[in-house]
Regions:
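Basic/polar N-terminal segments that are highly enriched at the extreme N-terminus
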Residues: 1-5, 279-282
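Oxidoreductase cofactor-interface core, primarily capturing Rossmann-like NAD(P)-dependent enzymes
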Residues: 2-43, 59-62, 68-89, 96-215, ...
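A hydrophobic C-terminal alpha-helical subdomain
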Residues: 222-282
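Residue-level recognition of oxygen-bearing side chains
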Residues: 53-56, 272
Length: 282
């Protein structure tokens, strides 16, 4: 497989870096798109290219990973260039809630265009796979770290809201498999962590990993929203997220087994994610 090249967009992000590593571990060559190739610090053997060079970067690749934030407003042009280059396969990452009403997708407030990018890939006329992860465990950093700088309490509403957050490495490894394995073509693959956890249960799990007696304190939604906004979160995002928590509070959380069935190992737990990122909370 030494001559097989894979092109990764969004290559320096939360998913991009572990995806590059996962592909390298399979012995294939990787071409990685990043806005700052000279500062990307990829492992040896990775060819870093700027977005402006995407036309030439597409030549000769076996498959292309389309990151929704990297593609975004340029998706149609990227699809045109991929078709022009005869790219044999596209793998796109969207989200598990991509079919929900757009007003019910909090990440859109931060600029995500999962629905539009996934649709452009599916409509491109090229073979495709769509990977639809649930919320990343990594999101807890942005949600809780500000509060935990000043104490051991996470204050928030809807402590009974549960979801099966996913480790970014599981997402990256699933995408790598989709790039490498043609048996997944034409599938929309929803992936989650191994178990649904309530917010008020996740906080003490994090505490056990970092050696602190953390706990969750229920507060009214209005008070929580004000605190989240003070900690730097976008106001529209906060209100859309809390509306989602309220709307889904009493619904069974979605838990899939696709990670285990496709990759052959169980999805990593939230406790594992916390241990892997313990230093980020210092």
């Amino acid at each position: 497989m030494d001559d097989i090249m894979y092109l990764v967009t969004g290559a320096t992000g939360i998913i991009g870096r572990p995806l590059v590593e996962a592909l390298l571990s399979e012995g294939v060559e990787v071409r990685a798109v990043t806005r700052s190739p000279e500062a990307a610090a990829f492992p040896a053997g990775v060819e870093a290219v700027a977005p402006e060079a995407i036309r030439s970067a597409l030549r000769g690749v076996h498959a292309l990973f389309v990151h929704p934030r990297a593609a975004k407003d340029d998706t149609d042009e990227l699809m045109r260039l991929a078709a022009e280059a005869g790219v044999p396969k596209l793998v796109v990452m969207s989200a598990i809630n991509v079919d929900d009403d757009l007003d019910h997708q909090p990440s859109r407030c931060n600029g995500d265009r999962n629905a539009e990018v996934e649709r452009a890939v599916i409509d491109s006329g090229l073979p495709w796979v769509a990977v639809r992860p649930t919320s990343f465990a990594m999101n807890t950093l942005g949600m809780w770290r500000g509060q935990l700088t000043f104490g051991d309490t996470v204050r928030g509403p809807y402590g009974g809201f549960a979801e099966a957050v996913i480790h970014e490495r599981d997402v990256a490894e699933l995408i790598a498999r989709a790039l490498l394995d043609d048996s997944l073509l034409g599938r929309k693959i929803a992936i989650t962590g191994p178990e649904a956890l309530r917010l008020d249960a996740m906080v003490p799990i994090l505490g056990a990993a970092i050696g602190r007696p953390l706990h969750f304190q229920e507060v009214p939604p209005e008070m929580a929203a004000q605190g989240m906004i003070r900690n730097g979160l976008d106001e529209r995002f906060v209100h859309t997220l809390l509306a989602r928590y309220h709307r889904e509070l009493n619904r069974p959380a979605t838990v899939t087994t696709e990670i285990e069935s496709i990759l052959g190992h169980p999805a990593r737990t939230f406790a594992t994610w916390c241990a892997d990122h313990a230093t980020a909370w210092a």
